[in-house]
UniProtKB/Swiss-Prot annotation:
Pfam families: ACR_tran (PF00873). This is Multidrug resistance protein MdtB. The chain crosses the membrane at residues 15-37, 345-362, 367-389, 396-418, 438-460, 472-494, 535-557, 867-889, 909-931, 968-990, 1000-1022. GO terms for molecular function: xenobiotic transmembrane transporter activity. Part of a tripartite efflux system composed of MdtA, MdtB and MdtC. MdtB forms a heteromultimer with MdtC. Keywords: Cell inner membrane, Cell membrane, Membrane, Transmembrane, Transmembrane helix, Transport. It is found in: Cell inner membrane. The gene is mdtB.
Length: 1052
């Protein structure tokens, strides 16, 4: 058994210094755990901060927005409104579709929310229309979340209806089964159907009406149980030719007899194989296509989900005919991977820069290797904790590790520098390691816990911003904690074995030059410090000025929520006049697509028109524009958007709204622009008055561009005004009139064709091409009580009116959403203030409430908590420092350095044109933790000099400043160079990382210059105040040896 040497000291590091094998194995265990954790960690763009969101879609073809609202949306909303944990409920009722989006509290598991939604739908079933062709369908997906993958399916020799059928059964269903997939939508879906187009004059001439024909078709196509025959020895199942599965079979269907002669369906109608909804269309570039948009469930690993889909895609494509082409047009994971790879490169670059700084200061290869090992060990070990905490490798956690490179090396540098000082005095390396580590142990603990204290308030933040902060803060805190452990264990052990007097005194040309340079800097610093200490009030004035300037800059700097990212993907909405027809809208959509594809930065696009669960009105078209990689284009996304809008502005009668796709999606509805706020009222009439006024007012204000709203009440409505008395006299009911209209103009789904793999519909309508426009109403015939035909225009008049294209609700009340983008040079904070001002200027009534949505709402919450967050961080750090130093005064001296960091960070943000956003706030909070390190190192040594050497406070702080100048400069430069790659990043997602780097670099430069002078002056000021109030002896008793307290000893 090894005998422990009698060398005293070492503190908590003693055991590790004397047991090098155990220490090495302990570090190897941390390294292996980190490597295993890294390999198991998922990859994503950002921490998972999605609200549990479920979308409920109910289709009712032919129904007006009013009918959809009252008969479908309202009954469902009443049931959904009773669910616990519901945060927000938004609905959109348009012609033929009801879409309800349910957003739940962050704490509610998505599976629990799903169960509640299913129960609510079941409870509302009896209240829904009896002729509803499809039941409500819910999907665990946020409709505002852009698809993770977009596939375009085109064909040359096969009808698109047949292609759609194959894609739905062979591809879409299989992809929907992949873990993490929330919804697969088929835009432009030409789902096969048998279309029956009635010839109204022929129907009237034969004395028939559409209801008779509908009933005949429904009765002729059935698929029901028929039973079986069970004899003495055999059992026989009954079957029949009760189904008709093709247009040819329907043509010969006998629907009535006249004078003994059969009337077949083909006598009064055109029957064809067509699409279930012929008012849907999609294109890949300019070619007709079926577009598959694959959306993820909230909270899943997007990379793993996309990889699973891509792995199975080749096998799925093999099941399709060779003439069918499937292309992946959009893959959001490619930019996520590129962004993460860029951050990983910046992390390695930061490590290299930090090692370079260490070598320049230590001027010794052996001394450089020791902290160089501490950096990767601390970072890799963090991955193990991240795995057990359920984190992912994402931009924020990698940014935390990049910043940590400058933090984790600090502790090792302080330990090495202190041990080296004793070795250079001639002590043996082992004795120097024990003495130096024991002496510096309390400082390391102070630095670590005070820095972690800064991050504690971040853990208590709620909502989206809190989730974002939490993963960043915990990752950084773990890295710092592991760094402290490494610095108190591995670092002094390696110093004892690798450093020697000869190696430290050995010099080369670089070391001699740097030695002279640092001696010159310290000499000039000593002269400047003397002057500053002799003119304390001037220095205090400067310190106070930095505090005032920090407040002024905070008030002046533009404020935002999240940096605008260039992910190479743009979402677009094309808006046409509200009365536009489907064919006209499709033509305009293709015209715009052709213009966009000419732009040199555009690689491809998909576009879609029609009404379904993703698009509420016919006058809106959707676009998804894929840009070329950053390396292949000259401009960033804001410039490209401006250029595209200018190019399209020459197309008459349309307005194009564009917004870049972001990794962070908080909204629950797909909007035309980036930012939204909602107006709520008790009636639609109030909204119709005030929404246009507010939109018009905002359009005049400077911070806004692309101001619009989803309030559309100028759609053309053909109002059928029935003379009820005349209809009753003829034995015609309102139900019969509604049925006749629905049969003629509603693309009514009247029967179902069942096959082994799918179900198809029979669609009934009038052949409107024969009699276009309102004249088609003249062909409508009904059957009176005497069996004779009655023209609809004999009992009703047709009036053309204006009406809503869609009716929106927010939490069951009528609502309208106003959307806007920011004008060049304006911040989100300025826009929010301008909205509030506009409401006052137009004198918006009190019974109309406004509420910001999505990222704008999150911005308000973040802005409101920013100041309190910084105050909480300062208070937490004061408490920790007060406990460690057993003093009320010294923590104030240390915290006096903070305004210098704030000034530097805010100035840097303003000079580089960045806003004060969530990422910048993280940087400022981290600066609070970094900058106080300078003061801690000064004050620790000053207190020790006063206590152990009997120095005066003046001499003690003066010597502490000179003695700790090099480690202070070294640790500051290490942190600065650790942040430098983030500030200078240019790759994918650089917009997200730059504000953090700018804050860190700017704050460190300014604080480094100022705190070297302000801290000693403030130290002497508080020392003088303490002596004047309590007396000299009492003051000396209060300066307790903190390291003795830590070891359980009584103070001397």
């Amino acid at each position: 058994m090894q005998v422990m040497p009698p060398t005293p000291g070492g503190g908590p590091s003693r055991l590790f210094i004397l047991r090098p094998v155990a220490t090495t194995l302990f570090m190897i265990a941390i390294l292996l755990a980190g490597i295993i954790g890294y390999r198991a960690l998922p990859v994503s763009a950002l921490p998972e901060v999605d609200y549990p969101t479920i979308q409920v879609v109910t289709l009712y073809p032919g129904a007006s927005p009013d009918v959809v609202t009252s008969s479908i949306t309202a009954p469902l909303e009443r049931q959904f409104g009773q669910m616990s944990g519901l945060k927000q409920m938004a609905s959109q009722s348009s012609g033929g579709a009801s879409v309800i989006t349910l957003q739940f509290q962050l704490t509610l598991p998505l599976d629990v929310a799903e169960q509640e939604v299913q129960a609510a739908i079941n409870a509302a079933t009896n209240l829904l229309p009896s002729d509803l062709p499809y039941p409500p369908i819910y999907n665990k997906v946020n409709p505002a979340d852009p698809p993770i993958l977009t596939l375009a399916v085109t064909a040359t020799a096969i009808p698109m209806t047949q292609v759609e059928d194959m894609v739905e059964t062979r591809i879409a269903q299989k992809i929907s089964q992949v873990t993490g997939v929330g919804l697969v939508t088929l835009s432009g879906g030409q789902r096969p159907a048998v279309r029956v187009k009635l010839n109204a004059p022929a129907v009237a001439a034969l004395g028939l009406d559409s209801e008779t024909i509908r009933t005949a078709i429904s009765n002729a196509n059935v698929n029901s149980a028929k039973g079986s025959l069970d004899g003495p020895t055999r059992s026989v199942t009954l079957s029949a030719n009760d189904q008709m599965k093709s247009a040819e079979e329907y043509r010969d269907l006998i629907i009535a007899y006249q004078n003994g002669a059969p009337i077949r369906l083909q006598d009064v109608a055109t029957i064809e194989q067509g699409a279930e909804n012929n008012k849907l269309a999609a294109w890949a570039n300019t070619q007709s296509a079926i577009v598959l948009n694959i959306q993820r469930q909230p909270g899943v690993n997007v990379i793993a989900t996309a990889d699973s889909i891509r792995e199975m895609l080749p096998e799925l494509i093999k099941s399709l005919p060779k003439s069918v082409d499937v292309k992946v047009l959009t893959d959001r994971t490619s930019t996520i991977r590129a962004s993460v790879n860029d951050v990983q490169f910046e992390l390695l670059l930061a490590i290299a820069l930090v090692v370079m700084v260490i070598y320049l200061f230590l001027r010794n290869a052996a001394a450089t290797i020791i902290p160089s090992i501490a950096v990767p060990l601390s970072l890799v070990g963090t991955f193990a904790a991240m795995y057990f905490l359920g984190f992912s490798i994402n931009n924020l956690t990698l940014m935390a590790l990049t910043i940590a490179t400058g933090f984790v090396v600090d502790d090792a540098i302080v330990v090495i520098e202190n041990i080296s000082r004793y070795i250079e005095k001639g002590e043996k390396p082992l004795d120097a390691a024990l003495k130096g580590a024991g002496e510096i142990g309390f400082t390391i603990i102070s630095l670590t816990f005070s820095l972690i204290a800064v991050l504690i308030p971040l853990l208590f933040m709620e909502d989206i911003v809190g989730r974002l902060f939490r993963e960043f803060a915990v990752t950084l805190a773990v890295a710092i904690l592991i760094s402290a452990v490494v610095s108190l264990t591995l670092t002094p052990m390696m110093c004892a074995r690798m450093l020697s007097y000869e190696s430290l005194r050995k010099q080369n040309r670089l070391s001699r030059a740097s030695e002279k340079f640092f001696d010159w800097v310290i000499a000039h610093y000593a002269v400047a410090l003397k002057k500053v200490l002799n003119h304390p009030w001037l220095t205090l004035s400067v310190a106070f000025s930095t505090l005032v300037l920090t407040v002024i800059l905070y008030l002046l700097i533009p404020k935002g929520f999240f940096p605008l990212q260039d992910n190479g993907l743009i979402q677009g909405t094309l808006e046409a006049p509200q009365s536009v027809s489907f064919s006209n809208m499709a033509e305009r959509q293709q015209q715009v697509a052709a213009i966009i594809l000419k732009d040199p930065a555009v690689e491809s696009l998909t576009s879609f028109v029609g009404v379904d669960g993703t698009n509420a009105t016919l006058n809106n078209g959707r676009l998804q524009i894929n840009l070329k990689p950053l390396s292949e284009r000259d401009d960033r996304i804001p410039q490209i958007i401006t250029r595209l809008q200018e190019s399209v502005s020459g197309v008459p009668g349309i307005k194009l709204y564009l917004q870049p796709v972001q990794d962070l999606t908080i909204d629950t509805q797909l909007s035309r622009t980036q930012y939204q706020f909602t107006l709520q009222a008790t009636s639609l009439e109030e909204l119709s008055t005030w929404v246009p006024k507010l939109v018009n007012e905002l359009q005049q204000k400077a911070p806004f561009q692309d101001v619009t709203s989803d309030w559309q009440d100028q759609g053309l409505v053909a109002f059928v005004n029935v003379d009820r008395d005349s209809a009753s006299r003829l034995g015609i009911t309102m139900a019969a009139i509604d049925n006749a209209l629905y049969n003629a103009f509603g693309q009514r789904l009247i029967s179902t064709i069942y096959t082994q793999s799918n179900q198809y519909r029979v669609v009934l309508e009038h052949d409107v091409q024969a009699t276009p426009g309102l004249a088609a109403f003249n062909d409508i015939r009904l059957t009176g009580s005497d069996g004779k035909g009655v023209p609809l225009n004999s009992i009703a008049t047709i009036e053309e009116r204006f009406g809503p294209l869609s009716i929106n609700h927010l939490n069951q009340f009528p609502s309208a959403t106003v959307s806007f983008n920011l004008a060049q040079g304006y911040s989100l904070g300025e826009a929010v203030a301008a909205v509030t001002l506009a409401e006052k200027e137009i004198q918006l009534p009190a019974d109309i409430t406004t509420r910001f949505q999505g990222s704008t709402l999150a911005f308000q919450a973040a802005l409101g908590s920013t100041l309190w967050l910084i105050i909480a961080a300062i208070v937490a750090m004061y408490i920790v420092l007060g406990v460690l130093y057993e003093s009320f005064i010294h923590p104030i001296t240390i915290l006096s350095t903070l305004p210098t960091a704030g000034v530097g960070a805010l100035l840097a943000l303003m000079l580089t044109g960045n806003e004060l956003d969530v990422i910048a706030i993280i940087g400022i909070i981290l600066l609070i933790g970094i900058v106080k390190k300078n003061a801690i190192m000064m004050i620790d040594f000053a207190l020790a000099a006063e206590r152990d050497q009997g120095m005066t406070p003046y001499d003690a702080i003066y010597q502490a400043c000179l003695l700790r100048f090099r480690p202070i400069l070294m640790t500051t430069l290490a942190a600065l160079f650790g942040a430098l790659p983030l500030m200078l990043s240019t790759g994918v997602g650089a917009e997200l990382r730059q504000p953090l780097g700018v804050c860190m670099v700017g704050g460190l430069i300014v604080s480094q210059v100022l705190t070297l002078f302000t801290t000693p002056v403030i130290y002497l000021l508080f020392d003088k105040l303490a002596r004047n109030t309590r007396g000299k002896n009492r003051h000396r008793d209060e300066d307790i040896d903190s390291s003795e307290l830590l070891n359980g000893q009584e103070p001397q």
